[in-house]
Amino acid sequence: MFAIIETGGKQIIVKAGDTIFIEKIEGKEGDKVSFDKVLAINDKIGTPYLENAAVLAAIEKQGKAKKIVVYRHNAKSTHKRKLGHRQPYTRVKILEIKEAK
């Protein structure tokens, strides 16, 4: 059984037991979270979401991704700017997919 959920402005295909990386959500490690924006479960498709359907997950880790370097340079001048950015993420383990009866 698989489901398509929406979180952090992205759509993700998940199955029970999967570990996924998503945009940061509030909570501590070990907390349980529920994703209510379920777009589809197997062959059932919502308009846009399925009612009374949820995906239950547990937060495994809060962290930051690898640093990316942002470098800006203006031609014909000596202006340069170098920045780094680390995007926060949350690693969650999918526990259960609850389907509406």
Curated annotation (Swiss-Prot):
Keywords: Ribonucleoprotein, Ribosomal protein, RNA-binding, rRNA-binding
Family matches, as SUPFAM superfamilies: L21p-like
GO biological process: translation
UniProt keyword RNA-binding present: yes
MF (Gene Ontology): rRNA binding; structural constituent of ribosome
Ranges that cross the membrane: none
Domain of life: Bacteria
Pfam families per UniProt: Ribosomal_L21p (PF00829)
InterPro entries hit by this protein: bL21-like (IPR028909), bL21-like_sf (IPR036164), Ribosomal_bL21 (IPR001787)
Keyword Ribosomal protein: yes
GO cellular component, one term: ribonucleoprotein complex
Function: This protein binds to 23S rRNA in the presence of protein L20.
Assembly mode: Part of the 50S ribosomal subunit. Contacts protein L20.
Protein family: Belongs to the bacterial ribosomal protein bL21 family.
Protein's name according to its UniProt entry: Large ribosomal subunit protein bL21
